[in-house]
Swiss-Prot record:
Known pathway: Cofactor biosynthesis; adenosylcobalamin biosynthesis; cob(II)yrinate a,c-diamide from sirohydrochlorin (anaerobic route): step 6/10
Domain of life of the organism encoding this protein: Bacteria
Record EC number: 2.1.1.195
Keyword hit for Membrane: no
Entry keywords, A to Z: Cobalamin biosynthesis, Methyltransferase, S-adenosyl-L-methionine, Transferase
UniProt-recorded name of the protein: Cobalt-precorrin-5B C(1)-methyltransferase
Family from the record: Belongs to the CbiD family.
GO biological process: anaerobic cobalamin biosynthetic process; methylation
GO MF annotation list: cobalt-precorrin-5B C1-methyltransferase activity
Catalysed reactions, semicolon-separated: Co-precorrin-5B + S-adenosyl-L-methionine = Co-precorrin-6A + S-adenosyl-L-homocysteine
InterPro entries to which the protein is assigned, alphabetical: CbiD, CbiD_sf
Pfam families, per database record: CbiD
Length: 408
């Protein structure tokens, strides 16, 4: 794909999603099934408005079905699914097929006004998940439990492109007692899925077919943030009304090993702390416990809500400023300022009279979060815990113990 964007003066190539791959493979398979003509490329439209010309691989034409694949191309935003072959198998089967593990447009409530839905084409197209496509096992996702993890936009795209092929004369092609069965599969899917968020989201057995625009934007955090938010939504729909936010693995281990709390409450936020606390507020959580390494949360104490180093650092400056306000001597402040890592600074502080700085930072972190949530935060309890790399508790905000009690 030769579509480019410029970010910070650098040129990056766009890619296309697993949803676009599934759509292209489905359209190509249906075309070859109906016409019996072999093709090497296929055109599809994307919600982004960028048309794609996709190379069709691994073609298998038989008397009763056609299979083919499209290779996933993530452009310069390479993820776990990059270069995977996403397959579609098209076949015409009896309408009374007893296998109910399929999707149609009617599975998506928001499509009541969709043109494909109005045309009733959806009654004749059933999309299944095959080998390597995950199955949804938990509530809160955009697909019902027990269904294949094929998201709404790819499902719409598949139906739209097939309608472009068949038009509204599908009954004359399929007959009243037949339907078009599309099976999406990915032989590498089960292995690749282990490198994705799917296990945390309760999607088992393979990858998801995703993408809201059909196009992968390089250097974009949008997909990552959305995956994190989905876990928040999912836990809410499972009945949880309180949540523990941690940056990553270390936070999860701290919650499990040091606080002995159930990790069912834990959601990882990565560096997107501001985004995720806003999402927690939007979804309706009223009790939020935050636990993180001092190197991350010291930034939040100064109002930095994306903790990636490319966005902001200032860890030494924040620490020096708070120690100075406590009356620390210049020589000590200078040693802190020369530390390369916060862990190095922690070692100095732990052997000093200024250990209270950790609680001060925790309280400032809490107040910054409350300010970030604006006036709507009065009914939300937020408390903060800061720990070191060896999972030792360093500090906590004033009412942390009371909030921890509600998670026990």
């Amino acid at each position: 794909m030769e579509e480019y964007v410029y970010i910070d003066g650098k040129k990056y190539r766009r890619g296309y999603t697993t949803g676009s791959c599934a759509t292209g493979a489905s359209k190509a398979a249906v075309y070859m099934l109906i016409t019996k003509n072999r093709i090497n490329t296929i055109n599809i439209d994307t919600p982004k408005g960028i048309p794609l010309l996709l190379k069709v691989d691994n073609i298998n034409i038989s008397d009763t079905f056609v299979e083919c694949s499209i290779k996933k191309d993530g452009g310069d935003d390479i993820d776990a699914t990059h270069t995977m072959d996403i397959y579609a198998r098209a076949e015409i089967v009896a309408k009374n097929d007893k296998n109910k593990g399929y999707l149609t447009l009617k599975d998506i409530d928001s499509l009541s006004t969709n043109s494909e839905c109005k045309s009733e084409l959806y009654k004749f197209i059933r999309v299944y998940g095959g080998t390597g496509i995950g199955v949804v096992t938990k509530k809160g996702l955009s697909v019902d439990v027990g269904k294949p993890a094929i998201n709404p936009t790819p499902l719409k795209m598949i139906n739209h492109e097939i309608r472009k092929l068949i038009g509204d004369n599908f009954e004359s092609i399929l007959g009243n007692d037949k339907v078009l069965k599309i099976t999406i599969f990915a032989p590498q899917g089960e292995t690749v899925a282990k490198k994705t968020f799917n296990p945390r989201l309760g999607i088992v057995g393979g990858i998801s077919i995703i993408g809201t625009t059909g196009i992968v934007e390089p250097m974009s955090d949008d997909g990552w943030k959305k995956s994190l938010s989905i876990e928040l939504q999912m836990k809410k729909e499972q009945g949880l009304d309180k949540i523990i936010l941690v940056p990553g693995n270390h936070g999860e281990q701290f919650i499990r090993e040091k606080l002995n709390l159930d990790i069912k409450y834990v959601v990882r936020v990565s560096n997107f702390i501001g985004y995720m606390i806003k999402e927690a507020q939007r979804i309706g959580y009223k009790k939020i416990l935050m636990a993180g390494h001092i190197g991350k949360f010291i930034k939040v104490s100064a109002g930095i809500f994306n903790t990636h180093s490319k966005v902001a650092d200032a860890r030494s400056e924040i620490l020096v400023a708070n120690l100075a306000l406590m009356g620390a001597r210049y020589e000590f402040l200078n040693k802190i300022n020369q530390c390369v890592t916060t862990e190095e600074a922690v070692e100095l502080i732990n052997n000093s009279e200024y250990r209270e700085v950790y609680n001060i930072l925790s309280n400032k972190c809490r107040e910054r979060v409350k300010q970030y949530l604006n006036e709507d935060s009065d009914d939300i309890d937020v408390e903060v815990i800061i720990f070191s790399m060896d999972k030792s508790l360093l500090g906590k905000s004033d009412n942390t113990d009371d909030l921890v009690e509600v998670f026990i």
